[in-house]
Every structure is written in structure tokens, then in C-alpha cells.
Regions:
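C-terminal beta-signal and adjacent terminal beta-strands/loops
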Residues: 2, 39, 89-96, 108, ...
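Conserved long hydrophobic alpha-helices within structured protein cores
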Residues: 27, 80-82, 105-115
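Short glycine/proline-enriched turns and hinge-like loops at secondary-structure junctions
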Residues: 62-63, 99, 126
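Hydrophobic, lipid-facing positions within transmembrane beta-strands of outer-membrane proteins
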Residues: 28-32, 66-72, 111-117, 152-158
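Short, surface-exposed loop/helix-turn segments at secondary-structure junctions
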Residues: 95-103
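Gram-negative outer-membrane beta-barrel transporters
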Residues: 1-94, 138
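Outer-membrane beta-barrel domain signature
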Residues: 19-23, 56-61, 102-106, 143-149
């Protein structure tokens, strides 16, 4: 229970937020986690589920009431592959426009898939890593006040370290 819940209000059109006192608000719910690994740890599965009840969803901005995250990991020698599924219910937040009017905004539920492939090598005192990842592979994008959210992205990373 919160007696003086502070929430951030986004000023429309600029990257500025300011706090306001929302007053009384409460949040309850539960989180659950499940994990399974093969004996040799070549395969791992983990799943998380969260469910929340809000006295007022606008008091807890951008907080979904339901979240599911599943992750499958395969490890074979130097390679590791992660496959990730994330699902979140709709989210709400408050913004204010240039005339001072409060706007109640809603982001639709999301359901995304990500993948990451990494290679780790060791040679004497050197360690190297290469990873390639893709986010939001199903390309479900959202737009908020002209700003694109959850875009499909690809990353290639290299790392080298020496003892």
C-alpha cells in the first residue's frame, strides 16, 4: 500500500517528465518461476509468470498486470543459443500536452521473440566472444506520440580480454 504514490508524467513532444503525487494506491499479486536443466546442462528452460492487481492502473505507469517470459538455452561446446519469448498485457501512462490537459495513453499488449547466438573462445591468457542477437523477430512494433517502440533490432558484438 502506498500513501503518497509518486508517478512520472510525460510532457508530450519533449523528453521531459515531472513527478506528481497520485495519492493512495495499492498493488498486490504474485511472481512464479520455473526452471529445468538437463543433467549435462546442454539444455535449460526457464519460465516466469507474474500477475498483479492494482487499485488504479494509472498509479503504476507502464506496469503490465500480466507478464510471461520463457527462455530456452542450448549449450554445445563453445556455442550458446538463447531463444526468448516475452508476453506482456497492455500498459497505461499519463502524459500532458502543451495546453496542460492530462492525456491517458494505452500501449497494446506485446508478444515478442528474441534470439541470441554467442561463441566464447579461450586461448592462453586471451578470452574472446562473438555474439549475434535479434530482438523482436516477429516485428511487432508500437508507436507512441510519434516514437516507435519495440522495433526489430539486430546486434553484432565482439569482445576480447587479456589476463
Amino acid at each position: 500500500h502506498y500513501s503518497n504514490k509518486i508517478k512520472q508524467v510525460q510532457l508530450t513532444g519533449v523528453p521531459i517528465q515531472f513527478p506528481i503525487n497520485f495519492g493512495e494506491a495499492s498493488l498486490s499479486g504474485f511472481d512464479s518461476n520455473l526452471s529445468f536443466s538437463s543433467k549435462a546442462e546442454l539444455f535449460n528452460f526457464s519460465s516466469s509468470y507474474a500477475y498483479y492487481l492494482f487499485s488504479d492502473p494509472m498509479a503504476f505507469q507502464l506496469q503490465p498486470d500480466k507478464m510471461v517470459r520463457n527462455k530456452i538455452t542450448f549449450k554445445i561446446r563453445w556455442f550458446q543459443l538463447n531463444l526468448i519469448h516475452r508476453s506482456e498485457s497492455d500498459r497505461q501512462f499519463t502524459s500532458i500536452n502543451s495546453t496542460g490537459t492530462f492525456l491517458h495513453n494505452r500501449l497494446d499488449a506485446i508478444n515478442t521473440y528474441d534470439a541470441n547466438l554467442s561463441l566464447k573462445l579461450k586461448f592462453r591468457d586471451y578470452k574472446g566472444a562473438i555474439s549475434f542477437s535479434g530482438k523482436n523477430l516477429n516485428n511487432i512494433s508500437q508507436e507512441l506520440n510519434g516514437i516507435s517502440l519495440y522495433d526489430q533490432r539486430y546486434n553484432l558484438n565482439f569482445g576480447l580480454s587479456w589476463k
